[in-house]
Regions:
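Short solvent-exposed strand-capping/beta-turn motif centered on an Asx-Ser/Thr pair
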Residues: 37-42, 95
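Intrinsically disordered, low-complexity Pro/Gly/Ser/Thr-rich segments with frequent PxxP/GP/PP motifs
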Residues: 54-89
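A generic structural signal for short beta-strands and their flanking turns/coil linkers
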Residues: 31-33, 43-45, 86-88
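C-terminal interaction-tip segments
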Residues: 1-30, 34, 93-118
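Surface-exposed, flexible loop/turn segments at secondary-structure boundaries
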Residues: 43, 57, 98
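Short conserved beta-strand and strand-loop elements enriched in small hydrophobics
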Residues: 50, 90-91
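Short edge-strand/loop segments of extracellular domains
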Residues: 52-56, 109-111
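Beta-strand signatures of extracellular beta-sandwich domains
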Residues: 48-52, 103-105
Length: 118
């Protein structure tokens, strides 16, 4: 098994529909340690955060975050993590496109050794 630490940055680029912000790769479990959202809009925005379970093809609402204009919020508080299995997704939705930026820090645990690291 290989452990890969990653930072993932993504813009919530659609309004009123779910956007896949991160998907755990094939044969990989992902442990999301931190998620920071920043609102670049002139007004406050609400962001709905969901976890998609690939095994059951079901979205589970995780949190609705209210973010003031030009401010950020941490989605995960002390000792909270999100564990995603292969194919699971972190999804977000906001009424306004291109105003929410996400940075997530995570650990990917591969079930097999990557060929570029052998």
């Amino acid at each position: 098994m290989a452990n890969i630490y990653k930072n993932v940055q993504k813009l919530l680029n659609a309004a009123g529909s779910d956007v896949d912000m991160y998907e755990s790769p094939t044969a990989t479990a992902s442990i999301i340690k931190t998620v920071k959202l920043f609102n670049t809009h002139s007004g406050a925005l609400d962001v709905t955060v969901k976890v998609f379970d690939a095994t059951t093809s079901t979205d589970f609402e995780y949190k609705v975050a209210s973010i003031n204009a030009n401010e950020g919020v941490d989605l995960l508080t002390f000792n909270n993590i999100i564990v995603l299995e292969a194919g699971d997704k972190l999804k977000m939705q906001c009424a306004t496109a291109d105003k929410i930026k996400m940075t997530a820090s995570l650990l990917q645990i591969l079930r097999t050794q990557p060929t570029d690291q052998i």
